[in-house]
Amino acid sequence: LIVRINPSWVLLVPLCIAPILMRVFFDMRVALYIHLTIVIILGNLVPNSFEFIFYQLITGMMSIISVKGFTKRSNFFLVALVIFLTYSMIYTAGILSQNTSWSSLQGDRYLMFLINAVLTLLAYPMIYLFEKLFGMTTDLTLLEISSTNTPALRELARNASGTFQHCMQVANISEDLISEIGGNALLARVGALYHDIGKIK
């Protein structure tokens, strides 16, 4: 539909949402496969297919890599910034490689890249929605409940301070050990933090 209205508006579509969601719920490999599939299919429907595929592949891979380093939900803004900068650098390099004049750069392209990056932030509420709909738990949720400021852990610290300190020590040890063998250190930490939560009563 967008292609029929204005082909250049295809750059407004936040295709990076799909690989971001796949990376958060599954892993990098699934995210990359899904993104490749979407880009190749859409590449056959838009004008300048090679340019479109090149833009989307590079930007999608950068978004997947950026998501890997999540430590909190606010990092979505960092991913959006990475997406904007990647689009902008690819476009700028492509134009300047053909024309030596900076005046050949189109300002509306950068505005499209910015809108695209902002729309990518819709992935945040979508993650929350999918977690609730399908009962899935992501690393982002684990990060939230691993905070010692959660009501359950605060009550444990207040009513059983010795047990709380024990849980903290086990959590730190578990996180280090699981990291060494390449497992999900965050999941191990959360499990260790709450393994004695029953002692609140």
Model-identified regions with their sequence ranges:
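Proline-rich intrinsically disordered, low-complexity coils
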Residues: 7, 14, 18-19, 47, ...
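A generic alpha-helix surface/boundary motif
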Residues: 15-16, 60, 168-172
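Acidic/His-rich, divalent-metal-binding segments that scaffold phosphate/diphosphate chemistry
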Residues: 35-37, 79-94, 107-201
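Hydrophobic alpha-helical scaffolding
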Residues: 4-11, 30, 48-52, 67, ...
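Short helix-perturbing small/polar motifs within transmembrane alpha-helices
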Residues: 1-6, 19-102
